[in-house]
A protein has these predicted regions:
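ABC-family ATPase nucleotide-binding domain "signature/switch" substructure
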Residues: 1-6, 27-39, 45-50, 66-72, ...
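Conserved coupling/switch loops of ABC nucleotide-binding domains, chiefly the family-specific signature
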Residues: 10-13, 166
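Conserved ABC transporter NBD signature motif
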Residues: 12-19, 29
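ABC-type ATPase nucleotide-binding domains, specifically the catalytic core motifs of the NBD
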Residues: 52-60, 74
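C-terminal boundary and immediately downstream tail of ABC-type ATPase nucleotide-binding domains
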Residues: 180-193
């Protein structure tokens, strides 16, 4: 929420490329960041238009390409009006995994250099999580990715893991380092196994 400036820091700074984000106009900052939330925000319009929110000037072909990369095409092709199907308020006519894949497609279409994945697998079953992983792999390629997760499997291969405890940073490092240095991280791993 700090990176996307939903809130400003009470103290200290949040920087992108060495620039305090408070010095970056909100519209410009929005272009640099894509957020995929656990609770996907969808509108009572077509699948095509829900994905196009990632980049309003995208052609239909670009929207469909992003949808295919996110793994949407399989379920969309079974819908009565495919990409023109109206999905209901907040995607009520879709499963959680389908809604999540639309959100990933939207982020792929936006093609922002910074991706925030906020607990996106928390409410998904293991099979659905595996299905969306392919879309995520397309989304994060060559990007700066910030993953907020309690599912530790999803962060084990990260370049840098930040362990938070009671609102403060307890430790930073790679998985193997944190197993040795962070009691909190070690306990979380033990509980997840």
């Amino acid at each position: 929420k700090l990176i996307s400036r939903l809130y400003d820091a009470d103290s200290g700074t949040v920087q992108i490329g060495g620039t305090d984000i408070r010095e970056i106009h909100t519209d410009s900052l929005f272009k640099y960041v894509s957020i995929v939330f656990q609770e996907v925000i969808l509108f009572n319009t077509s699948i095509m238009e829900n994905i196009r929110l990632g980049r309003l000037d995208a052609s239909d072909e670009e929207v469909i390409r992003a949808a295919k990369l996110a793994g949407c095409n399989e379920f969309v092709s079974r819908l009565p009006d495919t990409y023109q199907t109206i999905i209901g308020e907040n995607g009520a006519k879709l499963s959680g995994g389908e809604r999540q894949r639309l959100s990933i497609a939207r982020a792929i279409l936006k093609d922002a250099p910074i991706i925030i994945l906020d607990e996106i697998a928390a409410s998904l079953d293991v099979e659905t999580e595996v299905q969306i992983q392919t879309g995520l792999n397309h989304l994060i390629q060559g990007k700066t990715v910030i993953v907020i997760s309690h599912r530790l499997k999803s962060i084990e291969n990260a370049d840098k893991i930040v362990v938070m405890k009671a609102g403060t940073v307890e430790a930073c490092g790679k998985h193997a380092h944190l197993l040795k240095q962070s009691p909190t991280y070690r306990k979380m791993i033990e509980k997840s196994n």
